[in-house]
Amino acid sequence: MCFVYRDVLTDLFDRGEGRGMAVRSQVEVFDEGGTLLCTNRCTTLFPTLGGYGGQPMPRGASPIPERDPDLVIDDHIGAAQNLLYRLTGDTNLVHVDRDVAVSRGLDGPFVHDLCAYGYVCRLATAQLFPGHPEKLTRMFAAMKTVLYPDTPVQLHLWKLEEGKAAFRFVNAQTG
């Protein structure tokens, strides 16, 4: 089977001097017959390109309720998770090479954001739709910090209206 991808840059945002630029894109995936299979939306940050006077990044309201989560799920990011994720085709050395990561102001190699996103998806699906992963049809996240390998994590889930939930994925040691 062959897939056709249509990738469109939809927005550029100036996060300010020293804060970078954000690029939003939308990728539509079609099968050979032209049927739309899924749409992926992504915001990519370029930390060195801000401060050019462009449109500022809009602030979205956080959907997380001001109450304790309905569920807290404990898990652990393995010590080699960043290396395993590299097998998907990630070639960015910041995820595997300590010297590269440190040169960019990080403590060391970190787990790719999409890998962390996958953890959230797996944990949330197992709790909200046990045995029925096909029921998860949309998921949105904003990454706020890096996640290092060999880290205990928690997924905090808030059940909202029918078919919707909010979440926060955190380092269990630092919150």
PLM region descriptions:
Residues 1-73, 148-150, 154-175:
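HotDog/MaoC-like acyl-thioester-processing domains
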Residues 32, 44-111, 125:
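Catalytic strand-loop segment that frames the active site of acyl-thioester-processing enzymes
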Residues 99-174:
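Catalytic-pocket segment enriched in acidic/His residues
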